[in-house]
């Protein structure tokens, strides 16, 4: 992340711990981009509190971009109508739903302050291309609910959950998503997640089933390869877990969301 490191070092007052936190956020934020169907921009404050710098940007794999250009390296000056300014000054999430036009495209924008140790250290903007928003459905509704949970976690310093983890080979939202309630019951499984479990031998659906017993039934030898299945799949940590049998191998990436497991 040369742009992030260079701009933060040259232009901001952020300390090493904050810089590391933002680097970990950028490593993990594709999940937020994909579940919100949004482009994300990370803005950091200049030493001059009236200026903000774009240090990272990501586009969604689940929908069309809302931003034609790469804005990394650009700066914005103080504007009392700017969502970045409003979010930074208020430490509260801000949004506009008036379909602001960007290159002729109606775009909804959220600004999420990144709060650590009681202070706002950055702002993440979510830009959603409204022309590309998919028709409402079970998958879309669950993705947006997950995005709202992740946004709240980001706002309150709980996302990323496991700083320093290597996400390079981790599954993506497009590979499949499963939501698990605190009881362990599956409340939603995306089509690709269901397909992955079908390759493991699942005959029915996942909705309404309990994740841990289902995995143990499909992969009875799992304990013999040293997997701490219960702790991992209950989502108490952000971690990766291989589940496998003679038919297939799946990699699960689990995340604990305070009020609703992802």
PLM region descriptions:
Residues 21-52, 182, 200:
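Helix-loop-beta substructure at the N-terminus of cytosolic sensory domains
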Residues 130-140:
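Regulatory loop-to-helix N-cap segments in sensory/regulatory domains
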Residues 43-46, 53-106, 115:
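Regulatory input/activation interfaces that engage signals or partners
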Residues 124-132, 255:
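Short beta-strand-to-loop transition segments that serve as allosteric relay/switch motifs
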Residues 253-260:
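Conserved small/polar residues in nucleotide/adenosyl-binding loops
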Residues 114-121, 131, 241-250:
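Short loop/turn elements at sensory-signaling interfaces that couple input to output
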């Amino acid at each position: 992340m040369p742009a992030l490191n260079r701009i933060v070092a040259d232009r901001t007052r952020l300390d090493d711990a904050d810089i590391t936190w933002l680097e970990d956020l950028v490593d993990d934020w594709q999940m937020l981009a994909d579940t919100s169907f949004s482009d994300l921009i990370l803005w950091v404050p200049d030493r001059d509190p009236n200026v903000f710098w774009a240090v990272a940007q990501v586009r969604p794999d689940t929908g069309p971009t809302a931003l034609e250009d790469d804005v990394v390296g650009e700066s914005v000056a103080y504007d009392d109508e700017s969502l970045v300014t409003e979010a930074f000054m208020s430490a509260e999430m801000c949004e506009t739903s008036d379909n602001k036009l960007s290159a002729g495209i109606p775009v909804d924008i959220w600004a999420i302050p990144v709060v650590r140790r009681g202070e706002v250290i950055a702002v993440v903007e979510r830009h959603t291309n409204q022309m590309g928003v998919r028709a409402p459905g079970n998958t879309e509704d669950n993705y947006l609910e997950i995005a709202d949970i992740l946004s709240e976690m980001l706002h309150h310093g709980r996302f990323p959950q496991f700083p320093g983890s290597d996400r390079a080979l981790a599954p993506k939202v497009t590979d499949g998503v499963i939501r698990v309630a605190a009881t362990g019951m599956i409340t939603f499984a995306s089509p690709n997640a269901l397909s992955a479990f079908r390759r493991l031998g699942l005959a029915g659906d996942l909705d309404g089933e309990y994740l841990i017993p289902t995995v143990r039934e499909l992969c009875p030898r799992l304990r013999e390869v040293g997997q701490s299945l219960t702790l991992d799949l209950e989502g108490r940590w952000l971690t990766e877990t291989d589940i496998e049998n003679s038919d297939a191998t799946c990699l699960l990436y689990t995340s604990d969301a305070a009020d609703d497991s992802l």
